[in-house]
């Protein structure tokens, strides 16, 4: 398996930031009320990951280890602010829906994690591909949760798509369920927790069936991997790509 394919398989499935590492769950649970909001925040997060990873990789030789976290935050803040202004200018309705969750991308631990784990140790190309794969993995997770919650909680799919992609895409809007058949619980955060739990269980079941599950815990803070072999715990350093 080539390195590029491995990066995307890890980002989309094996090391999905939302379903495996369980990072950045606050926006995942809060903003996935419908599919369009989920796609909007997911793509914004993906752009932040790509741009911040590329920038940090370009200047990695000039970043002192003791000051790396403040530098990451400054770079990520600049990227998020730029994307926030673009969304406000060209997709104002989406901007109003996402609200505070766009600026909160700055504090999203997924972004800082990839910067410190990948971007500062690898080439620009690898850093960009890593940001793209991790971002798409998070976007797909949010889209799945948002679609399920919108269908069950509101009986629709792609509500408000014309505000993001234009009137020509209004035909994608679907009324799946009658308004009297919806289950409003899933439109609230408690429903988001329930759906996330079901999705996590489904992914773990598929991993077991396909035989691709890895019984190991990754410590994001120390970049260590705890590998369990024959009941014994062995600590190994995680290698960069």
From Swiss-Prot:
Intracellular or extracellular location(s): Cell inner membrane
EC number per UniProt: 7.-.-.-
Bilayer topology: Multi-pass membrane protein
Membrane spanning residue stretches: 22-42, 69-89, 91-111, 124-144, 157-177, 182-202
Pfam families: Rnf-Nqr
UniProt key word Cell inner membrane: yes
Superkingdom to which the source organism belongs: Bacteria
UniProt entry keywords in alphabetical sequence: Cell inner membrane, Cell membrane, Electron transport, Membrane, Translocase, Transmembrane, Transmembrane helix, Transport
GO biological process terms, semicolon-separated: electron transport chain
InterPro entries assigned: NqrDE/RnfAE (IPR003667), RnfE (IPR010968)
Recorded GO CC terms: plasma membrane
Keyword Endoplasmic reticulum: no
Subunit structure: The complex is composed of six subunits: RnfA, RnfB, RnfC, RnfD, RnfE and RnfG.
Role played: Part of a membrane-bound complex that couples electron transfer with translocation of ions across the membrane.
Family label: Belongs to the NqrDE/RnfAE family.
Name used for this protein in its record: Ion-translocating oxidoreductase complex subunit E
Protein species of origin: Buchnera aphidicola subsp. Baizongia pistaciae (strain Bp)
